[in-house]
Amino acid sequence: MYQGEELGLPEVLDIPVEFLVDPQGIQSGDPAKGRDGCRVPLPWSEEAPVYGFGPRGSTASWLPAPAAWGERSVAAESGDPGSMLELYRSALALRRQQPELGAETDDTALVWLPAPAGVLAFRRGNGFVCTVNTGSEPATVPVPGTLLLASAEVSVAPGGATLPADSAAWWRI
């Protein structure tokens, strides 16, 4: 996990040149060539312009954050069951609760499973299956067990489970 992924934050590719601090970006004059875009401070609150990063009353942080980051702040996503932050919290809690998801051993080795085009499926040990729809359309997969966690709403029917586009589901088998 890299800074901001737990909030669903993208890399900022349009930092104004006058705010660049990374030597690669400064020398090239191109924000996309430096590392500043992935170093923009995390938004802790919904309060612009610094979104809780810095002392109370701050008017600027060391790199400017996009205006839309307030709605993706820790404060905005905390407690929202549909947020990326709560998905990560749930996934980490699941991993702590299920020893099989910890360090790989001979009993918990990852095994790739057959899956439809655009879908990755793997088993971890004898207890878990993960299905990931990398496509831009919903995909139907066999139901391998009990749904534990999903990144989007999964519809389960007798013919299989439908994974929305760009989603993942974790199953107990």
Regions found by a protein language model. Give the residues of each.
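Short stretches within intrinsically disordered, low-complexity N-terminal or propeptide regions
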Residues: R123, A152, W170-W171
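Residue-level signal for pocket-adjacent positions within structured domains
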Residues: G37, W69, L149-S151, P158
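Beta-strand-rich binding/interaction modules
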Residues: E137-V154
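Charged, E/D/K/R/S-rich low-complexity terminal regions of large eukaryotic assembly subunits
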Residues: P116, P144-T146, A168
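A short acidic, often aromatic-flanked loop/helix-cap motif at beta-alpha or helix-coil junctions
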Residues: P49-V50, V154-A157, A168
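C-terminal beta-strand-rich structural cap/linker in extracellular carbohydrate-active enzymes
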Residues: P158-I173
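Loop/helix patches that line or flank the sugar-binding groove of alpha-linked glycan CAZymes
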Residues: M1-F128, E137
